[in-house]
Every structure is written in structure tokens, then in C-alpha cells.
Amino acid sequence: MLGAAGSAAAADINKGGQIYSMHCANCHGGSGIPMMPGSPNFQRSEKLFQTDAMLLASIRRGKNAMPAYAGLLRDQEIMDVIAYLRTMQR
């Protein structure tokens, strides 16, 4: 679960952006506007109103076409991505 660094506040936004570019942008779009039907628009997404823990669990398990990232990314890397996603909100 979440450790001492288990919040987006303790996360590294720059690393999150790098990870997002490598693993997420092809479907979710480089600026958060989705490229794949069914992907949330992170610039205007109610998905980002969820807690960090809820988003972490969602990314770990995946959904529909999105793969599960448990085992592919460490929890801290996912938290870095969550922190980066929160910068996309307008």
C-alpha cells in the first residue's frame, strides 16, 4: 500500500511526466486529451476528483483496454504519474 511517500504531494511531477509520456500518452494523449475512444479527458475529468489511493488502485488493476500496471510500475512511479495528471486539470 501507500508508504510515507504515498501521496501526490510527495511525488515527482517531472518523473510522472516522463512515465506518462512512455506508458500513457499513446491512448490518453500528450496533453490529457484522449486519443483512444473511452479514455478520460484528463483536462476535464471527474476521474481526477478521486483520491490518490483510489487512482493508484485503478491504475494498478487497469480497466477495459488499459493494462494493469501493478508489477510494471512501482507504486511511487504511479504516484508520480498521478501528480502529473493533476497538473492537467483546467
Which residues does each predicted region cover?
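Generic signature of intrinsically disordered, low-complexity, basic-rich segments
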Residues: 4-7, 21, 48, 79
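Electrostatic cytochrome c docking/interface patches
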Residues: 2-19, 54
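Periplasmic/extracellular electron-transfer cofactor-ligation site
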Residues: 11-40, 63-65, 87-90
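Extracytoplasmic electron-transfer domains, predominantly the class I c-type cytochrome c fold
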Residues: 37, 41-90
